[in-house]
Amino acid sequence: MKLVLAGAAPDTGNLGVSALCHATVAEVLRIAPETEFVILDNGEGARPSAFRSTSGKACTLAGAKSSRRYWRSDCFANIRASLRIGGPGATSREIRTASAIFDISGGDSFTDLYGPRRLKAIMYPKQIALENDIPLVLLPQTYGPFASEHPRRLAATAVRGALRAYARDTYSFGVLSDLLGDAFDPRRHASGVDVAFLLPALQPAELAPAVETKLSNPAQVVAGINVSGLIYNDPVRAKSQYGIALDYPAVMRDLVTSTLDTGADAVWLIPHVMTPPGHYESDLEASRDLRAGLAPPYRERVHVLDHQYNQSEVKWVIGKCDWFCGMRMHATIAALSSGVPTAALAYSGKTMGVFASVGVEDAVVDARKESTAAASELLLERWHTRNALAQRLNARLGDVVSAARDQMSSILRAVG
């Protein structure tokens, strides 16, 4: 069986997308180790054995980019045309012989929330699969929101044509069901679990000094915080595009200082999107700016974990925290799936749905609805009630992980 994995490029700098890639490949290979994978990324051409799974199996990377350089064989528009006319491009050749296309849309990008260019890129693999009669499996993901009718129609066409379509929570399943309308079939369409719950955690070869300190002194109480560069670095855009109603940098400062004032020995600022310096999405840049603005007594107890950890290594680090708070969806999933009591400051409904899947939806604070003062107070309350939160989370976690494994087995049976 040969599978093409789309919407999970491992070279974006977004560790959440990388987590989806590695978790999907690892789980499929655990069930069906003979599977051949072709992973669509942002590179050039097809590169056999350029990717290694966590089990060490070599997989092919194949360039597939949304670009205006239509003459390039790794441009999605070129790939789409080549498949129609039997063209010779390396990526189109790999797709043509696929048993199925597994598409995960970056977990949360099957929406017009991030603009038409992102949605166009997200739609390409789905359209390619349907146009070439390649079975399309929409892995557990968020569907919507869709503010405009045209994107909604595109999405409806894709989900109706898919062999299988899974939402990653009950809230998003409602959107999926609405898109399907009378095409809904409970044998093909289901509410599932984000595959990142299955991501293996791996201890890094090199540990940050702050992490070394925690390992040598397990009694040290550490609050882990993921600061989203997407929201922190451009507050004007955050308000206009995502409806952020509060002062996000102020909430993050309040959270750091209040946790240190009420029981935390240290705060780790843990980036989950490692884009180049100056990029508006950089969590690392946001974390450094936040720490620099703190008064010295706080600053010396706050550590920016700026090591170049991969998705599994950063999950291992997050798992050493006594409590975690994040805005990046997969930073919080890394914590939840490690059994760490976790809160979230959310800018879309996707977060509530995933937290509800493990029974802790009350740990989500909506940045679109709460004031700066109210959000700060609510997050601090989640910090104080972390032990009770941990008990509820861990009572559900085993069942969620089992469900994630069962859904992949079901998908592979459907693909055959």
Write out the residue ranges for each language-model feature.
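Active-site anion-handling motifs in enzyme catalytic cores
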Residues: M1-G416
